[in-house]
């Protein structure tokens, strides 16, 4: 099992890769909240170790306040970080469709 940090900005479709988006834009979601990421991770069976709602990804310190998303979550997953992020992004899209 791998432990790693997931920043909300890594899943945000509004951001370029320069500012921290990791997943492809077609899989990313607009303005993902830390609560959505946590819910998706738990529903997928990943262990959530820590949630920090006020943290800002250092890559976002130089951009407009409108584009900043706060929060990071530390999880444990059997997959690598890139695959885990893609799975979580797909789950968030699914959860949003249900609402």
UniProtKB/Swiss-Prot annotation:
Gene3D superfamilies: Signal recognition particle, SRP19-like subunit. Its main location: cytoplasm. Keywords: Cytoplasm, Ribonucleoprotein, RNA-binding, Signal recognition particle. It is found in: Cytoplasm. It holds the Pfam family SRP19. GO terms for biological process: SRP-dependent cotranslational protein targeting to membrane. GO terms for molecular function: 7S RNA binding. Belongs to the SRP19 family. Involved in targeting and insertion of nascent membrane proteins into the cytoplasmic membrane. Binds directly to 7S RNA and mediates binding of the 54 kDa subunit of the SRP. This is Signal recognition particle 19 kDa protein.
């Amino acid at each position: 099992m791998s432990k790693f940090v997931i920043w909300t900005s890594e899943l945000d479709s509004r951001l370029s890769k320069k500012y921290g988006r990791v997943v492809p834009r077609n899989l990313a979601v607009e303005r993902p909240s830390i609560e959505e990421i946590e819910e998706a991770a738990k529903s997928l069976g990943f262990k959530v170790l820590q949630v920090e709602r006020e943290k800002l990804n250092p890559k976002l310190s130089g951009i407009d306040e409108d584009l900043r998303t706060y929060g990071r979550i530390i999880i444990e997953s059997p997959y690598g970080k890139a695959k885990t992020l893609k799975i979580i992004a797909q789950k968030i899209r699914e959860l949003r469709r249900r609402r």
